Amino acid sequence: MINKEEISKIADYYFQVKRLANGIKSSTKERAEKFSKDLLAIFLLAGAKSFKSISKLSDIQKEIVMELTKKFREDIYNDIYQYVLESNKLSLELNDDLGWEYISMTDNGIKEYMERTYGGETTKQRINTNTNRFRAVVEVYLANTLLSIKTNNIEKITDEVQKKIWNNISSPYNVSFIPPSKQKHYGRGYATNGISQLYVIEQQMILGIFNEANYNSWKNIPNFKGWRTAVTSKNPCQFCIDEQYRIHTDRPKLPFHAHCLCILYPVFNT
């Protein structure tokens, strides 16, 4: 059963994370900072609506949880949707600045392209679908992580969550990276058109949750053991392959990988 202190802790983390969050690096830094601060609030807030013992809470405790959940859905979900929607424009700006080949989102041809490629969904419908999928992955990851301290099989939970994250990243996007150009962005892969670039940005949003998080706050959770690298790419780099079975008591810093989508996740003693 969740006691009053635990509910209060969720609320404290919510505001704590919003205060401490650092803005992600972006050409639209102001918007990215606002988005990252709200997005990081998901870390504990997403779990608030998913606690199995919520029915056992007192009326006051339920009211607190529901209030947090309502704010989470109304404020943060809206920010997620708007960011994904606006990333259309960001995608075109990036492509235009770097001289990449792209298809304009405003061209009539884009509708035919979307219908041919995505079964009749318009650009907005596609973005909405991806946003919903993104929300689901975040909720599943965090709800399970919070609940995992009460289970005896941490590995099984995290493995299942990693599968969901990988499925979200890999399908049905099928983003094809090509070797980076030294004249444009040395050391980074890039997509071949504006639509693919949009999905790359969405992938970066997912990874940003983990890369920009206040990981130190997890050390205060009971039974915390350390950090482990989760390989979420079909073709991970050798660094992540070597690191995936190691547990670090201090958070290791993952380098930026052009073709490797890997994250860190907390491990708890069973």
Where are these regions (language model features)?
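Acidic, glycine-rich two-metal-ion catalytic cores of nucleic acid-processing enzymes
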Residues: 178, 182, 186-270
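N-terminal leader/targeting and assembly helices and adjacent pre-domain segments
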Residues: 1-192, 205, 270
